[in-house]
């Protein structure tokens, strides 16, 4: 039997549907973010990254880089084992304490990625609650969906950010059935925010637990970077907060923060935590440095919001189809998978601008887009270059513009 035919067939389907993904070979340069070297088929080229999740540029911050180098030099590279077998090193313990403090919780638990923290965290927590009903927002991330699926618990999906729909499901479940509401605080493809205070109201009214993914908000919102929950004053009302070290903090890893009993139970039962090597000491020290810095420095957050607002204003003024967003995410609607890929290719190859196309299954078919993520280091000149390049690409591909604004805000 020719087993390769099955894989070729699967890949052919992706090509036919115009959603086969090609990775750009990039080399970031510390001190020059958002500039990078693109190792293209035709050789090296200088490009500007407009889609990085290193939202605040902390991956190049001297404190963060310095902490990583110092720790690696002092203690070596790897963790040396799982958490249970020689892998619970001191920088990791310090990082978990820093995260617990960030979110005002008794404890925190680290995982190898934000995907794993959601997948393993939700699955383990829900499994430990007899007859648990999980109420999940329809736009939750794949990692949350997989965690819910692996829990084996009953799941009901409520319409995105629809409080009436959520309340109807809570009411139908009854006061005595255990319930877990799972949602994100900031949805990364549309840039909209969950009404966390009102979700907490419903959870308290109907005796439900809450699990909130703050992956795209930690570091960037709240007076100390605790996320949307901190900004909205509801951290203490949310049972489990989940986040990542790989975006605003510029490092690697995921975590959950909660009361001591929940964290201890997940630590003791979660396969995705127990049976894997711990995060390296240098990564943990770097993440701790990033968190400590952002707890006291507001420059990065303020500059980030300023840059995002300017990008939206300039692109809207140019008549480009900027989708509505209340946050730092700037989605640019295209609505066609092939043209979305073509737009991305033209921006990179002809303008030295890297924006990865966002196609199905990340977003629904017909809602394909370019997802732009400004950083504090995208200056006015780069923003103007972006707008001009996008207009040229839109014209080249025959993509529609909307009516231009009179001026940038």
Curated annotation (Swiss-Prot):
<dbReference type="Pfam" id="PF00155">
    <property type="entry name" value="Aminotran_1_2"/>
</dbReference>
<feature type="binding site">
    <location>
        <position position="21"/>
    </location>
    <ligand>
        <name>substrate</name>
    </ligand>
</feature>
<keyword id="KW-0012">Acyltransferase</keyword>
<feature type="binding site" description="in other chain">
    <location>
        <position position="216"/>
    </location>
    <ligand>
        <name>pyridoxal 5'-phosphate</name>
    </ligand>
</feature>
<keyword id="KW-0663">Pyridoxal phosphate</keyword>
<comment type="similarity">
    <text>Belongs to the class-II pyridoxal-phosphate-dependent aminotransferase family.</text>
</comment>
<feature type="binding site" description="in other chain">
    <location>
        <position position="244"/>
    </location>
    <ligand>
        <name>pyridoxal 5'-phosphate</name>
    </ligand>
</feature>
<dbReference type="GO" id="GO:0030170">
    <property type="term" value="F:pyridoxal phosphate binding"/>
</dbReference>
<feature type="binding site">
    <location>
        <position position="362"/>
    </location>
    <ligand>
        <name>substrate</name>
    </ligand>
</feature>
<feature type="binding site" description="in other chain">
    <location>
        <position position="188"/>
    </location>
    <ligand>
        <name>pyridoxal 5'-phosphate</name>
    </ligand>
</feature>
<keyword id="KW-0808">Transferase</keyword>
<comment type="pathway">
    <text>Porphyrin-containing compound metabolism; protoporphyrin-IX biosynthesis; 5-aminolevulinate from glycine: step 1/1.</text>
</comment>
<dbReference type="InterPro" id="IPR050087">
    <property type="entry name" value="AON_synthase_class-II"/>
</dbReference>
<dbReference type="InterPro" id="IPR004839">
    <property type="entry name" value="Aminotransferase_I/II_large"/>
</dbReference>
<protein>
    <recommendedName>
        <fullName>5-aminolevulinate synthase</fullName>
        <ecNumber>2.3.1.37</ecNumber>
    </recommendedName>
</protein>
<dbReference type="GO" id="GO:0006782">
    <property type="term" value="P:protoporphyrinogen IX biosynthetic process"/>
</dbReference>
<dbReference type="InterPro" id="IPR001917">
    <property type="entry name" value="Aminotrans_II_pyridoxalP_BS"/>
</dbReference>
<dbReference type="InterPro" id="IPR015421">
    <property type="entry name" value="PyrdxlP-dep_Trfase_major"/>
</dbReference>
<feature type="binding site">
    <location>
        <position position="276"/>
    </location>
    <ligand>
        <name>pyridoxal 5'-phosphate</name>
    </ligand>
</feature>
<dbReference type="InterPro" id="IPR015422">
    <property type="entry name" value="PyrdxlP-dep_Trfase_small"/>
</dbReference>
<comment type="subunit">
    <text>Homodimer.</text>
</comment>
<dbReference type="InterPro" id="IPR010961">
    <property type="entry name" value="4pyrrol_synth_NH2levulA_synth"/>
</dbReference>
<dbReference type="GO" id="GO:0003870">
    <property type="term" value="F:5-aminolevulinate synthase activity"/>
</dbReference>
<feature type="modified residue" description="N6-(pyridoxal phosphate)lysine">
    <location>
        <position position="247"/>
    </location>
</feature>
<feature type="active site">
    <location>
        <position position="247"/>
    </location>
</feature>
<dbReference type="InterPro" id="IPR015424">
    <property type="entry name" value="PyrdxlP-dep_Trfase"/>
</dbReference>
<feature type="binding site">
    <location>
        <position position="136"/>
    </location>
    <ligand>
        <name>substrate</name>
    </ligand>
</feature>
<feature type="binding site">
    <location>
        <position position="277"/>
    </location>
    <ligand>
        <name>pyridoxal 5'-phosphate</name>
    </ligand>
</feature>
<keyword id="KW-0350">Heme biosynthesis</keyword>
